[in-house]
């Protein structure tokens, strides 16, 4: 797990996000070669990515297009990792799949939805308990979350964030399955949602006191604060794997984009600005 001191910099990073993003974009644009670009054939890519990547990926795509002007993107699909798999299995077209769960990517691989040898781990994330800013809540453990009488929201078991949350709650006896799915809650009745973004919205609105979400979600949803960082030892590592889809007719361009996401300094800057760490 990344250093817990990251929580001290979340609000600062959020406030600096707009200016640093523009700086990265300017750097990419100034470094592009118009002569090389002119020789490239136009290509359009379709990206399927986990919902928690929405803002970061949109930001990255805009920067990518400044140095790759021959590449355009269809409306990227941002859904839960399970829903993305279901769409691909139903025949939807995509060039690149990025999941918020190694398990969900394993399923995609087992069903032949991705080109196996293109799979690579791209990003890591952390799991946190969040509340509205200036909540005044003093929480030092998951046991406090469970026993403190708080209204809690978590993702349901169809989404990776929900699985990670339930694995964590299992560690304090508040969920019955160590795998984070197929069990039931003990002593609590959390509000369940099929989107980790909606969990954040429930906290924002005051419908619940606390939510278990990704660290990166606090960069997407203003007005929230971290009240507890959940140790990685009580849940699976949060890894975002990416791969080329077997449906892709533009695998060379898709591979170039994946390589850029993983290795380019401006891309890495974008992911970090939105709260992700590189895998």
Name these PLM-found stretches.
Residues 68-74:
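A generic structural motif
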Residues 118-127:
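Short, glycine-/small- and polar/acidic-enriched structural segments
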Residues 25-66, 77-82, 86-89, 101-102, ...:
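Exported/periplasmic ABC-transporter solute-binding proteins
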Residues 94-99:
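Periplasmic-binding protein-like
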Residues 1-20:
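N-terminal secretory signal peptides and thylakoid transit peptides that target proteins
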Residues 111-118:
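A short, gly/pro- and small-residue-rich
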């Amino acid at each position: 797990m990344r250093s817990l001191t990251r929580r001290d910099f979340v609000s600062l990073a959020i406030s600096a996000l707009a200016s640093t993003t523009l700086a990265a974009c300017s750097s990419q644009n100034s470094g592009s070669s118009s002569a090389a670009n002119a020789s490239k054939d136009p290509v359009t890519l379709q990206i399927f990515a986990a919902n928690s990547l929405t803002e970061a990926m949109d930001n990255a795509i805009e920067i990518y297009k400044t140095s790759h002007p021959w590449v355009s993107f269809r409306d990227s699909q941002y859904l839960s990792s399970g829903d993305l798999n279901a769409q691909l299995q139903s025949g939807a077209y995509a060039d690149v799949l990025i999941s918020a769960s190694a398990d969900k990517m394993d399923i995609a691989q087992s069903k032949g939805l991705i080109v196996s040898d293109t799979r690579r781990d791209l990003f890591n994330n952390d799991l946190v308990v969040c509340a509205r800013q200036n909540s005044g809540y003093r929480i030092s453990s998951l046991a406090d979350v469970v026993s403190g009488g708080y209204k809690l929201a978590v993702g349901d078991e169809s989404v990776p964030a929900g699985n990670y949350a339930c694995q964590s709650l299992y560690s304090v006896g508040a969920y019955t399955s160590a795998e984070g799915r197929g069990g039931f809650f003990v002593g609590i009745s959390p509000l369940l949602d099929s989107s980790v973004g909606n969990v954040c919205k429930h906290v924002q609105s005051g419908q619940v006191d606390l939510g278990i979400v990704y660290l990166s979600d606090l960069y997407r949803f203003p007005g929230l604060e971290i009240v507890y960082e959940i140790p990685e030892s009580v849940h699976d590592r949060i890894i975002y794997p990416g791969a080329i889809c077997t449906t892709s007719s533009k695998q060379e361009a898709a591979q170039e984009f994946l390589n850029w996401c993983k290795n380019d300094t401006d891309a890495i800057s974008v992911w970090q600005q939105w709260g992700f760490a590189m895998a």
